[in-house]
Regions:
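A detector of single, family-specific signature residues
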Residues: 1-167
Length: 167
């Protein structure tokens, strides 16, 4: 499988983020397909079921558990990948090696994601939120960073992956 990945156009995207390595990226991208169909990261979050359900009536608004609609494999992988952000942000030797040869914009996005997601994890835990709820919240934001990384890399990807790209 790793031999097939050498020529894969998404390899750079897969190597950019902490906790989101090649196999997870390959499965997620194959499950989600073309990310250009989502005009905003909130649409991708909703597609994956990482948004809260809502029960509203009149002036009362109640948000519940995540909707769990969409692809359960991709949602599960994002939740598993989000566990890497429990630790303090740092560029490890492994991550640094994976990021060799990548553009400065990709590395900056990776660091911004690491810093924000680790901070979000710590803040939610300090507020007394349960571990699973915190990890799902981090996975939801990780989803947005994956969408942004796809937008950033979109011009460099082959035309076959840009079939629905909107200007």
């Amino acid at each position: 499988m790793f031999e097939l990945l050498e020529g894969w156009e998404w390899k750079e995207v897969a190597d950019a983020l902490k906790g989101f390595q090649v196999v997870a990226a390959m499965i997620t991208i194959s499950e989600l397909g073309d990310l250009t169909r989502f005009k905003h990261p909130r649409q991708l979050m909703g597609f994956l079921g990482l948004v809260p359900s809502e029960d509203s009536t009149g002036t009362r608004r109640r948000q519940g558990a995540i909707t769990k609609c969409g692809n359960s494999h991709a949602r599960w992988l994002l939740i598993e990948s989000a566990q890497a952000y429990r630790n303090t942000p740092k560029v490890s030797a492994k991550l640094s090696k994976r990021q060799e040869g990548q553009s400065g914009a990709v590395k900056a996005l990776s660091w911004r994601a690491q810093d924000r997601l680790s901070g979000r994890y710590r803040r939610l835990k300090l507020r007394g939120k349960r571990e699973n709820k915190v990890i799902v919240a981090v996975a939801r934001e990780l989803c947005a960073f994956i969408w942004e990384l796809h937008q950033l890399m979109g011009d460099d990807l082959p035309a076959s992956t840009q079939t629905h790209r909107n200007p």
